[in-house]
Amino acid sequence: LNPGGVRIGTAEIYRQVEKVPEVLESIAIGQDWDNDVRVVLFVKLREGLALTEALSQQIRNIIRSNTTPRHVPARIVQVDDIPRTISGKIVELAVRNMVHGQPVKNTDALANPEALAYFRDRDELKS
């Protein structure tokens, strides 16, 4: 990730999000936005939970207090699943390509390629 020209590792964000018990998994990408890049965090929550403004704020506060303001996502979006390779690694590039309307290569290497559909044409990412 490179918002405002500052290099940020996604692992720094994931380490903070792991502290939020409501979140099962997350994936962060850089979305091209307004001649820059903004951080977008997708979260898979525990069953039966919905992403509220309070939970979004809790996630942002944990990230901000343990990293830098640049690490704080501009958007947090709930998804039902996060795509992974057959070996279990989350696939940030595939999600980034879906968000940007670009083709995703090598979907045969994904354990759950159907999860990619959750990242296409999200209204939350159009403003």
Segments (PLM) and residue ranges:
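Adenylate-forming
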Residues: L1-E18, F42-E53, T67-R75
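Positions that flank functional sites
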Residues: Q16, D32-W33
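Short acidic amphipathic segments
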Residues: V17-S26
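Conserved C-terminal "lid"/linker of ANL adenylate-forming enzymes
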Residues: E25-D32, V40-L41, R60-S127
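N-proximal, solvent-exposed segments at the start of the mature chain
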Residues: D36
